[in-house]
Amino acid sequence: LEARLDRVLPGLMAEYDAEMWVLSMREYAEDPVFWSVVAPTTFAARRRSIYVFTRRPDGSVERLALGGGTQGGVYEAFRSSRPVSEREGDGEGNAELWGNEQWWLFRELVEDRDPASIVLNIDEHQAFSDGLHAGEREALERALGPYVDRVVREPRLAVDYIAVRVPEMMPRYREVEETVHAILSRAFSNAVVTPGETTTDDVRWWLRERIR
């Protein structure tokens, strides 16, 4: 994960002239990109998870999480230092990242970074680039305020980030390939197929049951 974010994302954001990329989603309504930007032990967004990627002048990318955790230190957890009442916060005077407080903090971040372009995952053609749900988009655009005029659609950013692999991933892919070949070999062997009796549907169901 860290290798992809370190080596793949900066080049893509530069190529597509994206100064900021925002991924915002709610629990069990994740963006398709979600599983490519979080640790493998993270199975769902946390209430609302907002990940913000900002391109720095030197070409590197700042990675901030506004809810959703740091994913083992891959992200910096962006927190507000503004005092809030115990009722609104976590009991210790710190703002809890949920609801309006989360959006206010997001607005602070955008104002501070002042990006010329903000990429959101909205696209009518590419499913992998259309992960911003309708209600989430409305809330996000309200939070952006005047910065909504800087929103751009760049579907290639999400698609290419999901698609590009780094060398460290290849050994695992070879293991997956070996597993697939082993399953297919058994599916079409006499261990599963009885000539004259076994149907193609039988084989399909065997495969479904085997991989679940």
Annotate the PLM regions.
Residues 1-212:
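A composition/biophysics-driven feature that prefers long, compositionally simple stretches
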